[in-house]
Amino acid sequence: MIWQKLNQLQPKIKFKPQIILAIISLILAVGMSISISNKIPAQARTEKNYEEKLFETALSFTLYFEGGFSNHPADKGGRTYKGILQSVYNTYRRRRGLPPLDVTQMSDAELMEIYQGYWDNSRSATMHPALAVVMFDTAVNFGINNSVTFLQQALGLPQTGIFDTKTKEALAEGNNRNTALQMINERIIYRYKRVQEDASQMAFFHGWLARDYSLWGYVEKLKDN
């Protein structure tokens, strides 16, 4: 069982009571009254505006946790602004023939285009609403290939990090909320392993768990359509 795995990993971690309260507050803050296209009559809803609404729903959660600039010495990703690494921004500008620029100078239009890339390349739009939100947030937080790896773990597949035929077939059967929650479980397990392997990552541990448990609450309140 997943929670048995978690219990095996937890003993060395002291979880502060105030962190638990913060997690509960975050779940309540981001999880209330969430609905996808519930104000649009079903017969009038088009595929395009449904996808746009779903993207907005996913983005609203991710931006809640990716609000500002970070350059913590223990963060292996380095300089990060609104969830975008400096290295990712460098690649984005280079591919467009633009000169390098500090990530903190990134425009809102560039930010949205990069986020749209995460959405498209993770194939989130093809998924159940709950899974789409989790897949997108995982892609931003861990990278596209790693998001596929987490999905494969949740589906009980070999972890290749590639959206291959077996993954597509398994997703066709497991495109649901349970798979989304299983992905979050896999993220939590990964966090515990990460801090046990590298004590410097404890600086981020409580923030990571706040994000994961808040994501759990967020997707549980999503309507299926």
Could you say what each language-model-derived stretch is?
Residues 2-225:
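Cell-wall polysaccharide-cleaving catalytic domain and substrate-binding groove, primarily
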